[in-house]
Amino acid sequence: MYGQVERKRVNFGKITNLDYLPNLIQIQKRSFDWFLQADVKDETKRKHQGLEAVFRETFPIESPNNDMIMEYSHYILGEPKRSPQECKDTDATFAMPLKAVIRLIIKETGEIREQTVYMGDLPVMTEQGTFIINGAERVVVSQLHRSPGIFFSYDMERDVFSARVIPYRGSWLEFEMDNKGILIAKIDRKKKFPATLLIKSLGHGTNEEVLRLFYSSKKEKIAGATSKDLKKILGRRTINDIINMETGEVMLEAGSKVNEDNISILKEMKVKEVELIEFPKGKDNPILINALEKDGVNDYEDAILKFHSLMRQGEPSTIENATTELTRLFFSPKTFDLGEVGRYKINSKFEFNNPKEFSGEKARVLRPADIIETVRYILNLFSETENYYPDDIDHLGNRRIRSVGELISNQLKTGFSRVERVIKERMTVQEIETQTPQLLISIKPITAVINEFFGSSQLSQFMDQTNPLAELTHKRRLNALGPGGLSRDRAGMEVRDVHYSHYGRMCPIETPEGPNIGLILSMSSYARVNDYGFLETPYRTVKNGKVTGQIEHLTADKEEYHYIAQASGVIDEKGELKNKLISTRHRGDFPFRNPSEIQYMDLAPLQVVSVSTALIPFLEHDDANRALMGSNMQRQAVPLLREEAPFVGTGMETRAAYDSRICIVNKHDGVVTSVDAETIVVERKGGKESDTYSLTKFKKTNQGTCFNQKPIVGVVHSEINGKVSKVSKEKIEVTGENGELKEYVLQIGSKQYAPIVSSGEEVKRGTTLAGQVVVGEKLDEMGNILVKGTVLADGPAVDNGVLALGRNVLAAFMPWEGYNFEDAILISERIVRDDVFSSIHIEEFEIQARETKLGPEQITRDIPNLSDKAFRDLDETGVIRIGAEVKPGDILVGMVTPKGETDLTPEYKLLHSIFGEKAKDVRDSSLRMPNGFEGTVIDIKRFSRENQDELPAGVEEMVKVFVARKRKLLVGDKMAGRHGNKGVVARVMAEEDMPYMEDGTPLDIVLNPLGVPSRMNLGQIFETQLGFAASKLGISFETPVFDGAEESDVDNFCKEANLPLNSKFKLYDGRTGLPFMNEVFCGYIYILKLAHLVEDKIHARSTGPYSLVTQQPLGGKAQFGGQRLGEMEVWALEAYGASHTLQELLTIKSDDMLGRARIYEAIVKGIHSIKPGIPESFNVLVQELRGLALDIIITDSEGNTVDISDYEDEYSKSKKKIKFETIENA
């Protein structure tokens, strides 16, 4: 690309700094690296996480009779057998073999049998953060789910608080108040009992012990107390049992209220003082005491036995059984797991901070202290104690991300638990002498769960590959649905709504419209996931009113306690906040605070929104609903034949294209030495090694768009034969054979070229003189980009390393003859002629030759009963040639299938013996071009068993044919801008008839001005105006979101370009040459062509398939279905009195089987009268009513009974008759 000068880019951003932007697909790659730990050199020293944790939690496995034990040492990862591209071509899975070193120890002899056991193939993530499963590229979407831990909630209707202990795995424990005012505990939402029973089962056996756990007490005098003092005691509760020392009788139970009778009894007993409960705020809150009265036990043993009898009804209760059951429920790592996250949440909630106590397996189970603190917290909530609040379950501190690594781990745990069961069974069955790890381990359960997860899980999705942005967004998506998540039907408004804790973590704009709104979200640009799975966002730290250069990432929980200034806060030269009062964010409020009270400041205005939303220029002038549509529609833009970067962008385009990994990025510093359409060679610094980069050419994506890479770096070739006369950093001079001097400059714009030849060297025309200097990519440990590598080749929808989803077109906002009514779009014929919005789409067609019972199918050119014309583009093997133009019905691959052998006549046998195979019974089963498809064959892929290709069982040969088609813009295609301004092409008009400007420039596109005010997306107006200035000045603008160009900036550039400040121009009618009455707003707007192409949707049916039960035509283009005539269409026909049309539509054109047969007969014979019969759906209704035991009798207009079976007989007769007559007439 020598000599090509890039457009100058002007950035309006004052604050936005993309250097701190994390690697945009980091969430996928980091999570998978965490799971696999492939880069750990010593395999025996991997951390207890991911795959290693799955092995460690499964092993060791002890045999049921304790005579042997199986231990795990470490796992080994092999190399994938095929490259990602080979996997796509052969419909294989990109996976690596997983092996584990397993030891079987025989206890009696101490013998150790060690083996490396193959554990199956594990799908591997590609460089792009995707998986290739059965040849298709898939993405595992991160799940947003409720974090494990303890949560307190408030039920407004019942005015009660409840607590819920949610583990990562295991039984749920809940505390709440029932209708009788008793604090109850629930296990797994089934078993219900007083909460105090559980507390007593933990070792606090008596009522007094329980009360002392939760309440403080105060001793009050009775002996010698005045009546005034005694009045204060009345109504208060005792903390301990008051016992008559002489008789041993309990006079007053712990928790009982003191009344006048009690006082007189206590005086008689000569009790000097009583110890009374000090309730918080002095409020008597009896829910715990009511539970004590209800539980009916007063020591540990009774409590734990009663607990066991409730949990295991019908089983004998012993102390041992009861203790085991309680341990199993909450205190055993095998059955209960809070996870690191759950423990972290509990510790931060109750401010536990003893690190020794929370290490290893102990940290992941509940402790008695956790249960006691939970009850204490709920009692404080009921007492309205200060600093005790219920949790907000929609707060991002209580919702976490389960990324790909964690999701695969959870699946493997299921598979490994099944493997454990199989191993234990085999240990008891097989002879101890012959047992080895290989024989004991069955890998089928592991393979099954891996295949199930990647193939059919709700979170493993077919990648949206329409364009690079769609791909990038899919990898950054957060899904609240899926296993263990929410369900679409039950999710309410609260969980879908934008929450203040989403700020900087999840985009408040980008979410689907429809039933999934608010459940499927996108990560904000700067957000990252921490080790616990919580989303963090970066802030600049502020100390004593001065903004430091330090950056800190905060979770939603930590952010709660701080005042955070906006990124747009005014800072002086010293870095101090200027104003006396600064607008801040604090929880859900926006208070003004002194600079000294501020601890953090936003990093960039961009950090609120996702990548898609950050690509919308002048977003601040758009309504949120339209911005949502704009974000979503950019992902549907089809990559065009000729890409063009927007005149008005946001600066995010370069980073989005770079991080999507669809461009080829240079790995090491060096110089480009060779460039062609398929390879780029870069010689590394030092000249000892070189890297060769292969480009992907015209491959089909998941959505059928074209994936093609084009080099954008270059070399300098000599244009003459001669000798190099001078070499310097600035230029190379070559003296030709005839003495002419040719000069080559080595600095063009931002591109620097380095000489490859030396002075005095002989060169020929085409010899490489110099290569472009390129920079290698450098990443940090987290995978973030420290130095961006030079982009060597553009991918689809990328222009010179800049994301280019659409084209800049000259637009006017004016109505034109109603052709842009209701958002329709009028476009110029130039757009179609010059392929401005043309795109390439690729379809794949596949055929398999199988082994059948009657013999093998054969791919051949020798197909019976076809003309020579049908074979014109097939090669000698029966496969179409590359470059052939194909239309519907054309043969792509010729194939014959053997027919069933019939009793052969003597004549046939004679012919067979004379002509051999020709007359043999074969059926044409060739692969033909389906209806509605045409194009050019661009590639053929053949696989056969003879060539040792891996094929599915029973398949002998497989051929794939790729057909490409250039699609020009058509009437009916959907187009859109970046501001949610969408419409359908209504008319393609001759260029000379389009309105034109005073200098004679015809418009490219005419949009309806009425689409702007009501939609409130004024961003398109600013974009159009600035776009015109960019076009005139030959530059591009970057206006970052919430930090972009102001009105004054737009005006200044319009002045510089000699454009009117209101961007209104005098336009002339192309048909008459007369000027329009008013001036019209014009400029350059960036328009996308969306994947909703009219050719994929338009469809017509003559006759086709019918539903088996109702006999009505099927629906949809895929089934070659009919058009539904609904209730409202029936009303319309009734209103017009079109009775015959209506009857025809409801009977013979739909499900009147006899009528259909008769009309066919009538058409064949040329008869024009028809008599409709009974629709088949009526018969279905009758049978359904009979199924409900209703006696249905059908009568005609005269009251005579009609038998439907007669009608069916008539249908079958008429069918035979028609068949016979048709053959006869033929």
Swiss-Prot record:
User: What SUPFAM superfamilies would the database entry show?
Assistant: beta and beta-prime subunits of DNA dependent RNA-polymerase
Gene Ontology molecular function, alphabetical = DNA binding; DNA-directed RNA polymerase activity; ribonucleoside binding
User: Which regions form coiled coils?
Assistant: none
A Gene Ontology biological process term: DNA-templated transcription
What does it catalyze?
A: RNA(n) + a ribonucleoside 5'-triphosphate = RNA(n+1) + diphosphate
Q: Per the UniProt record, which EC number(s) apply here?
A: 2.7.7.6
Pfam families assigned: RNA_pol_Rpb2_1, RNA_pol_Rpb2_2, RNA_pol_Rpb2_3, RNA_pol_Rpb2_45, RNA_pol_Rpb2_6, RNA_pol_Rpb2_7
Print the keywords alphabetically.
DNA-directed RNA polymerase, Nucleotidyltransferase, Transcription, Transferase
Gene Ontology cellular component list: DNA-directed RNA polymerase complex
- Which class of enzymes does this protein belong to? transferase
CDD domains reported in the protein's UniProt record: RNA_pol_B_RPB2 (cd00653)
Q: How does it assemble?
A: The RNAP catalytic core consists of 2 alpha, 1 beta, 1 beta' and 1 omega subunit. When a sigma factor is associated with the core the holoenzyme is formed, which can initiate transcription.
* Summary of the function given for this chain in its UniProt record: DNA-dependent RNA polymerase catalyzes the transcription of DNA into RNA using the four ribonucleoside triphosphates as substrates.
Annotated family: Belongs to the RNA polymerase beta chain family.
What is the protein's given name? DNA-directed RNA polymerase subunit beta
Provide the gene name from the record: rpoB
